Design a protein with these regions (language model features):
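A short beta-strand motif characteristic of beta-propeller blades
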Residues: 276, 313, 390-393, 431-436, ...
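Blade/loop signatures of beta-propeller domains
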Residues: 33-48, 457-472, 510
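Surface-exposed extracellular loop regions of Gram-negative outer-membrane beta-barrel proteins
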Residues: 497-522
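Asp-box/WD-like beta-propeller blade repeats and closely related beta-sheet repeat scaffolds
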Residues: 426-447
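Small/polar beta-strand repeat architecture
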Residues: 67-279, 312-327, 335-340, 346-401, ...
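Beta-sheet repeat architectures centered on beta-propellers
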Residues: 2-68, 78, 276-312, 393-408, ...
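Hydrophobic or amphipathic alpha-helical targeting/insertion segments
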Residues: 403-433
């Protein structure tokens, strides 16, 4: 018989550990984990289920840039487009805007002359537009009266005879109290049933159910603001064999369904917005900049917010105008240039049909140039006709990286992609550095160090003159350093520029070219993957050939016996490195956490792997606690703390930019978690224990549900195990300060259950507690557990 009951408390800490034998781990680290997926070691204690992610913007990042209509008067089932640098494919869908309008749900006017049993009403003092279908209210007006005819804004006809005094104020409203029917005015184009509707605050998927005169009925009830701009579009799908792409001209001819009605023939230069793609395209880079994110996709760059996406690789050459009338052929004389247009720039000309491409770099003299163009001019432009540049080439870009800086009081971001010239962007103007030296053209890395931009290309490190971002003259303080090995990463650390190669780590100290000094940190350890380098908690984490390492450790102990900080999960790291073909990393600063995320085109989103580490000690690897992630599929990622808000974003090949640490699910999908303690011998592995009860201490952020299982004797094959136990922590509705409204149905006296007590059934020599959840519940922490047991006979 078992003896008197005893208790065994376990504090959950230490993270994932897999480099110990099961019994060693159970004896020496009972609070650690043998499995820890989608839980994070928390700086507040315990293991916390990770937060989810959501779409940063509900639309896909445009895969083909900002293509436009190439030639007016097109209709039917074919369409020529231009300013497209990647070929569309069969099955892609795109949207054409065919009409715009403003919401005009409310208007007022004053009766101008007594109305006596008449349907004719004269008004003045109008505010807003009166349109047919509006309901009319005011003193003396019967219920249900509507406007049937608008002769003009001062003379209307209503649906029944009325007697209204002079100077009575009348109010005109859209007739639908459910807000599916709205009145619109200032209509441009033709609105038709079935069209897609977009505008500020309108969710995706809203369409036109019907239209009668100025009254538009929508598929979804919406409360639309007065004067809101509405856009009405049709969605088209590219048919089989429906793409003819001209790579040299950056144009395409599309065949699609349904057809474009002649009434909705688009104008030259109108936008063609692709809404979905049949093929996947990798996001090549994402960099948080101010309150937006700069995203590289295929051959273009975009500025993305939660509500809009704007192409930024649009050159700014000044106010460019046609210089002289009667020009024809394949050249165009222009003036007003502040810099030289480049080959493959794309532009349109006011008053001239078609879209045009610059076929050779221009030479500018006194602001003027003769542009070589294709195709030949469709017609002769007028003198001083405006030239509008649509995009400049960023073709064949590789992984795109960014550096933020501010030398003049204006925030800027530098952009490199390993192929094209570097570019600068200040949230308004995009500048390609077309005149950089060969050693900078095609740079793969860029950082801001000592108020100079440093560019890494192959084995060369080139820097601008101090406080400049485009001066590469030696006399001004620019220079180039040869490293003798290919650069794999750059980072600023402790007022030094740290330079990584595959086999060494170097540091550049000093302030200017006059005292810059390159010194080795180590010559036999390097970084094998560029995008794993991050500063976290006063150290620099990076992926070495045998695992994750900390630069501070290297700096302190030189070249001898450098151990990696991920040795406690060496098996998982080795598998992670071998399974994935590319890596991205981010730092979550308020958690002192580093995340490295793997990418492989053959691994689905739900199986995408990652490793996270939380740093508990001030510096060094001794305080790192690890866990694994599943379901965060990232090819590129970035994080930044700006104006007290930390933004963490990532992207892959599904078209969307995602925001990490946002929400309770993975973009609508459940978060699946597992945490299993070691197999604990509880004092003596040779003595059988009978398990009676468990007390689980948690810290939830809302109503949650999860399962707990007791696994006995190393869960050996064919062994009988106790059934799992389900925990749910809410006995009623729950409200949190700041999120619930007074007067709602929330019960403020209801508290979340944080201590769970449950009976245990089973006996064995060792025991492990396993927790699992598969839900969209809010995050929760598992802090500690106390197990009641009795001792039986010795084995």
């Amino acid at each position: 018989m078992p003896s008197t009951r005893q208790t065994y408390p376990v504090e959950f800490k230490g993270g994932l550990v897999t480099n110990m034998s099961p019994l060693q781990q159970g004896i020496n680290a009972p609070g650690s984990a043998r499995v820890l997926k989608n839980f994070e070691p928390s700086i507040e204690g315990g293991y916390r289920r990770i937060q989810g992610y959501t779409k940063y913007n509900s639309s896909i990042i445009p895969p083909y840039g900002n293509p436009v209509i190439n030639g007016a008067s097109q209709s039917g089932g074919t369409l020529n487009i231009a300013n497209i640098r990647t070929t569309p494919v069969v099955g892609d869908t795109f949207k054409l805007t065919h009409a715009t309008a403003q919401v005009n749900n409310t208007a007022t006017a004053v009766v101008n002359g007594t109305v006596s049993s008449s349907t004719n009403v004269a008004v003045d003092g109008n505010v807003g537009s009166i349109v047919v279908g509006m309901t009319v209210t005011g003193t003396g007006v019967d219920a249900g009266v509507t406007v049937t005819t608008v002769t003009d804004q001062n003379n209307i006809v209503v649906s029944s005879a009325q007697s209204i005094a002079d100077d009575v104020t009348l109010t005109f409203n859209a007739p639908d109290s459910d807000n599916t029917t709205h009145i619109v005015d200032t209509v441009v184009g033709t609105i038709k049933a079935g069209m897609d509707v977009s505008g500020t605050g309108i969710p995706t998927g809203v369409t036109v159910s019907s239209i009668s005169g100025s009254t538009v009925t929508l598929s979804t009830g919406l409360d639309l603001a007065e004067d809101l701009e509405l856009t009405f579009s049709d969605i088209y799908t590219i048919s089989s064999g429906g793409v003819s792409y001209n790579a040299s001209e950056r144009t395409a001819a599309l065949t699609f369904t349904p057809t474009i009605h002649a009434d909705n023939s688009p104008s030259n230069g109108d936008a063609v917005e692709f809404t979905s793609t049949a093929s996947n395209y990798l996001m090549l880079g994402c960099g948080v900049f101010l309150d937006r994110v700069i995203v590289a996709k295929n051959d273009d760059l975009f500025k993305v917010s939660s509500s809009d996406i704007t192409q930024i690789n649009v050159p700014s050459y000044g106010t460019v105008l046609v210089n002289g009338a009667s020009q024809t052929g394949s050249s165009l004389v222009v003036d007003g240039l502040t810099s030289a247009p480049q080959q493959h720039d794309i532009f349109k000309i006011a008053g001239v049909d078609k879209i045009y491409r610059v076929t050779a770099d221009a030479s500018v003299i006194s602001g003027g140039a003769t542009l070589a163009i294709s195709p030949a001019l469709d017609s002769s432009p007028a003198d001083d006709a405006a030239i509008t540049f649509l995009s400049t080439s960023r073709e064949s870009a590789g992984k795109t990286r960014f550096a933020r800086y501010n030398y003049t009081g204006t925030e800027k971001i530098a952009i490199v992609d390993g192929t094209n010239v570097p570019a600068l962007y200040d949230n308004t103007t995009f500048t390609a550095l077309n005149d950089v030296p060969t050693d900078v053209n095609g740079a793969s890395f860029v950082v801001n160090f000592k108020n100079q931009l440093f560019f890494g290309k192959s084995n060369l490190l080139t820097f601008t003159a101090p406080y400049t971002d485009n001066d590469f003259t030696a006399a001004a303080g620019s220079g180039t350093i040869s490293l003798g090995a290919t650069i794999t990463g750059l980072i600023i650390f402790r007022q030094q520029l740290i330079i990584f190669t595959e086999t060494s780590i170097l540091q550049l100290v000093g302030n200017t070219i006059a005292d810059f000094n390159l010194q080795p940190i180590t010559l036999d350890i390097g970084c094998v993957d560029t995008d794993t380098i991050q500063e976290v908690g006063g150290d620099v984490m990076f992926l070495g050939p045998d695992g994750l390492r900390l630069l501070s450790g290297t700096d302190r102990i030189g070249d001898f016996g450098l151990g990696n900080v991920s040795k406690t999960i060496q098996k998982e790291v080795t598998s992670f490195i071998s399974t994935n073909t590319s890596f991205a990393s981010v730092v979550i600063r308020n958690k002192s956490q580093y995340r490295i995320l793997g990418y492989n085109t053959n691994i689905t989103q739900e199986n995408a792997q990652g490793i996270l580490g939380t740093q508990f000690a001030g510096q060094g690897g001794e305080g790192m606690a690890w866990a694994e992630t599943r379901g965060i599929r990232a090819y590129v990622a970035d994080s930044r703390f700006y104006q007290n808000i930390e933004t963490i974003v990532f992207g892959n090949d599904d078209g969307y930019l995602y925001q990490m640490e946002d929400g309770n699910n993975f973009d609508g999908a459940n978060i699946q978690t597992t945490f299993a303690t070691p197999f604990m011998p509880i004092n003596d592995p040779r003595v059988r224990k009978t398990f009676y009860k468990a007390f689980l201490y948690t810290d939830p952020q809302g109503s949650v549900s999860f399962d707990m299982s007791l696994k006995l004797d190393f869960d050996q094959k064919d062994s009988i195990q106790p059934t799992q136990i389900n925990f749910a922590n809410s006995t009623g509705q729950v409200a949190f300060y700041g999120t619930a409204e007074y007067g709602s149905s929330a019960v403020f006296s209801t508290k979340l259950l944080t201590l769970f007590e449950t009976q245990l059934i089973g006996s064995g020599f060792t025991g492990s507690i396993q927790f699992e959840s598969d839900s969209t519940d809010p995050p929760f922490s598992l802090d500690a557990i106390t197990i009641e047991f009795g001792i039986n006979t010795r084995r």
